[in-house]
Structure formats: C-alpha cells, structure tokens
Curated annotation (Swiss-Prot):
Its cofactor is Mg(2+). Substrate binds at residues 114, 164, 168, 286, 318, 370. RuBisCO catalyzes two reactions: the carboxylation of D-ribulose 1,5-bisphosphate, the primary event in carbon dioxide fixation, as well as the oxidative fragmentation of the pentose substrate in the photorespiration process. Both reactions occur simultaneously and in competition at the same active site. The lineage of its organism: Eukaryota, Viridiplantae, Streptophyta, Embryophyta, Tracheophyta. The disulfide bond which can form in the large chain dimeric partners within the hexadecamer appears to be associated with oxidative stress and protein turnover. InterPro entries: RuBisCO (IPR033966), RuBisCo_large_chain_AS (IPR020878), RuBisCO_lsu_C (IPR000685), RuBisCO_lsu_C_sf (IPR036376), RuBisCO_lsu_fd_N (IPR017443), RuBisCO_lsu_N_sf (IPR036422), RuBisCO_lsuI (IPR020888). It comes from Kigelia africana. This is Ribulose bisphosphate carboxylase large chain. PANTHER family: RIBULOSE BISPHOSPHATE CARBOXYLASE, RIBULOSE BISPHOSPHATE CARBOXYLASE LARGE CHAIN.
Length: 470
C-alpha cells in the first residue's frame, strides 16, 4: 500500500539484520543485554539498536522523509553469554553519519543515552566499541603521548614514580608544598593532587599552585632531574578550569590534571587541546568510573571509558593496579592497558577485547597504577605494567616511618632494583621478594619500608570478571 502506516511495530522487523555485513566505517558496539522475561533476544537487541540510533516507540510520518536504511543502527549478531541463563551479547553497527566529528560527548549521547533506561531491558552494559579509523582521525587525542613525555622529562627505560599527597584534604598550601618537595627530592618523578583537591576554603587553588611550583623547582635544582606535580585544574565551570591551566603554564610547570568523568568530556577535550597547544602534559583521573563500570550486567566497561579518553585526550590515566586496594582483574586490566598504549590491538576475548582496534596515528596514553600499593608490590607492578607506566604510591610513600623523603627513597631504590634485575634476565614474578630483600640490605630506607608493610594485602575477588569459556 502507498502512504504512511501508523501504529507500533516490532523493532526486530526493522533493526535486527543478521545478514548485514559491517563496513569499515561503522562504529561497532558489543552490548551485554539482559531482556525482561518474555522478551526474545532478537527484539531486545533490535530495541537497543533502534533506541540508540533512529528509532522511537511508534512509526512516525517523518520517517518517510529520510533514508532509514542509510542511518539506522543494526543489530547484526547475537550470542548467549556462557554460564548466564538470560544474558546475551548483542552486536550493533552504527553508520558513521550518526555522529558529530571529534565529539566523544555526541558519540556517548547516542550509544549510551536513553536506551539504558529502556523498559524492555532488565539491564544493559556496553562491553566494547570498535571506533573506525575514519572517525578516529577527527580527534586530536592525547596532547603529547608516551614518547614525547619521555623526551620532555628525559627519563627512559623504567616506569615513572608518583605519589598522591595525603591527607588528601585539610593541609594548608604551604604544608602541602612541603610534602611535594620532600617526595620529589627523595627520588620520585611526580607528585599528585588528589582528585578531590580543587579549590577549597583551607587551600585555594592559586596558593597551592604557587607553593607546588616552588617545591618542584627546588627539588629539580637539588636532584638534577626534571620533576612534575599534577596540578588539578578541575573546576565548577570550563572557564575556571581553563584559567587554572593558563596559570599553570605561566608558572612553567610541566603537567596539569583533570577529573575527566566528573568534569565531562566536553571540558576534557577543550583542556587537552589547550595542553597540546601550550606544551603541558595532561594527567587524567577517573573518579566516578566505578559508578559506571563496576556492575557486570549494567553500565559501561572501563575499556570503553579508556578508549573514549584516548580520543578526548590525556597523557596519563588511572587504570587499576591488579595488586592493590581497588578493583581490577589482571587479564581485563592488561587488556585495556594495551588499548591505551598500543597502536593496534587484535580482538582477544580472553582479555575482554571484543573488536580489533586500529588507532592509526593517535598517540598512546600512559597507564597509572595507583591505590593501596607499597614496596613489596614493586616487582609485580614492574612485571605487569612494564616501562611505559606510572606507579603511584600515596600512603606507600607518605606512610614511611621516617617521613616523606625516606619513603620516596625506598620506592626509588625498590624500582631501580627491579628494573636492574629484569634487565639481567631475572624472573620478577618468582624472585620478587628476594630482589627487594637484597636491595634493602644497602638501603636502610627500603628496609624500614619493608618492615612496615610486610603483611599488608587486599585480598578480595574482583567483581567484574571475564565470562567462562564456552
């Protein structure tokens, strides 16, 4: 019949297309879908494709004014999740025309927007995205990347060492700067503002920036090494954030910091552009990520947030520790660590990687291991993360019984010992404790640290684990 046929029709009639062959320019998404009882997986998968692209709940007259075939998302493959009675991985392909160039904000508004509140689904989780090279080329990405950062810092062949200044809230700017100086003088490469530190009554941002810059230059002069402190530019408005970044540049410091999820992708991308134009490195903290990524059946996996950050821009990002106090299983963590650092990553379901991803010319991001780690973890961290990483010890530096500078010395000695042992061909996983003990014989600072933390472990099973093999 000619003309418009009003009414409601099943999504799967339009949006479930198992015969579809994906294009190189499509954005591909893997969703973990838990349909409501009685809703077939084809209908649920098609509903996800529809609601995150061109569809709405009823047919509309204006559908006839455009080519739905050109613009609609398509659910092209569904597979049951092994070991789960009512979960399916639904693969959806989106035509590239649906997205604004260079906008992570727009990409997420579509793909993880209203569809997550959809009644026909009990739960929905975005497991992975394949970003086509054509879309990647519309993003600047990280301001500098791994190689440029090493060249700026003149540090090669080892992981970098950091420390989050604690107590995270309550110090005056002067005392805060003192702690920064002691840690950097003791041998760390970086110190860090805690993510909660913005500009509170006890320490306004400008005072903190000044005292930290002074600490940094003093430590640089005494050690002959380039030092950095992540000055947190996160603020209540984009304008205020940029004002803080400009002041950091005027002070001549090497690096600023942003909380990219609470600050938002629009603000983050603006800041990343400023950092590239003005030679600032950009450290990214992922505060709020666990709200989005910790539940296994709903939300968004961190590997998607990591990909989005590489597009939006950042030179460092927190990526879990595998061995510390915060969530992160080894295979999954290494999966998205490689996604951050490498140019090309093959599909590998054993590490939770659903798609092959080619980053073309986008620089890499350095993963930061931080949270409940100390000197006994150093061999494992060196082995797991390799050279292109930042290992951050907050309490593991400042909790040293002799103070901050000896805490920094202990970490630097432990790191150098692990790197030396690895370069000599020793097995860090098997001999880690022995390597640390040997080094502590000639470093009293390390010996004291070893004594304090010899029994500390955070042994809980990860919540977000890989699915069993079929």
């Amino acid at each position: 019949s000619v003309g418009f046929k009003a009414g409601v029709k099943e999504y799967k009639l339009t949006y479930y297309t198992p015969e579809y062959e994906t294009k190189d320019t499509d954005i591909l998404a893997a969703f973990r879908v838990t349909p409501q009882p009685g809703v077939p997986p084809e209908e649920a998968g098609a509903a996800v494709a529809a609601e995150s692209s061109t569809g709405t709940w009823t047919t509309v007259w204006t559908d006839g004014l455009t080519s739905l075939d050109r613009y609609k998302g398509r659910c092209y493959h569904i597979e049951p999740v092994p070991g789960e009675a009512d979960q399916y991985i639904c693969y959806v392909a989106y035509p590239l025309d649906l997205f604004e160039e260079g906008s992570v904000t727009n990409m997420f508004t579509s793909i993880v927007g209203n569809v997550f509140g959809f009644k026909a689904l009990r739960a929905l989780r975005l497991e992975d995205l394949r970003i086509p090279t054509a879309y990647i080329k519309t993003f600047q990405g990280p301001p500098h990347g791994i190689q440029v950062e090493r060249d700026k810092l003149n540090k090669y062949g080892r992981p970098l060492l950091g420390c989050t200044i604690k107590p995270k809230l309550g110090l005056s700017a002067k005392n805060y700067g003192r702690a920064v100086y002691e840690c950097l003088r003791g041998g760390l490469d970086f110190t860090k503002d805690d993510e909660n530190v913005n500009s509170q009554p006890f320490m306004r941002w400008r005072d903190r920036f000044l005292f930290c810059a002074e600490a940094l230059y003093k430590a640089q002069a005494e050690t002959g090494e380039i030092k950095g402190h992540y000055l947190n530019a996160t603020a209540g408005t984009c304008e205020e954030m940029m004002k803080r970044a400009v002041f950091a540049r005027e002070l001549g410091v090497p690096i600023v910091m942003h909380d990219y999820l609470t600050g938002g992708f629009t603000a983050n991308t603006s800041l990343a552009h400023y950092c590239r134009d003005n030679g600032l490195l950009l450290h990214i903290h992922r505060a709020m990520h666990a709200v989005i990524d910790r539940q296994k059946n709903h939300g968004m996996h961190f590997r998607v947030l990591a990909k989005a950050l590489r597009m939006s821009g950042g030179d460092h990002i927190h990526a879990g520790t595998v061995v510390g106090k915060l969530e992160g299983e080894r295979d999954i963590t290494l999966g998205f660590v490689d996604l951050l650092r490498d140019d090309f990553i093959e599909k590998d379901r054993s590490r939770g990687i659903y798609f092959t991803q080619d980053w073309v010319s986008l620089p890499g991001v350095i993963p930061v291991a931080s949270g409940g780690i100390h000197v006994w973890h150093m061999p494992a961290l060196t082995e797991i993360f390799g050279d292109d990483s930042v290992l951050q010890f907050g309490g593991g530096t400042l909790g040293h019984p002799w103070g901050n500078a000896p805490g920094a010395v202990a970490n630097r000695v432990a790191l150098e010992a692990c790197v030396k042992a690895r370069n000599e061909g020793r097995d860090l996983a098997a001999e880690g404790n022995a390597i640390i003990r040997e080094a502590s014989k000639w470093s009293p600072q390390l010996a004291a640290a070893c004594e304090v933390w010899k029994e500390i472990k955070f042994e809980f099973k990860a919540v977000d684990t890989l699915d069993p093999e079929k």
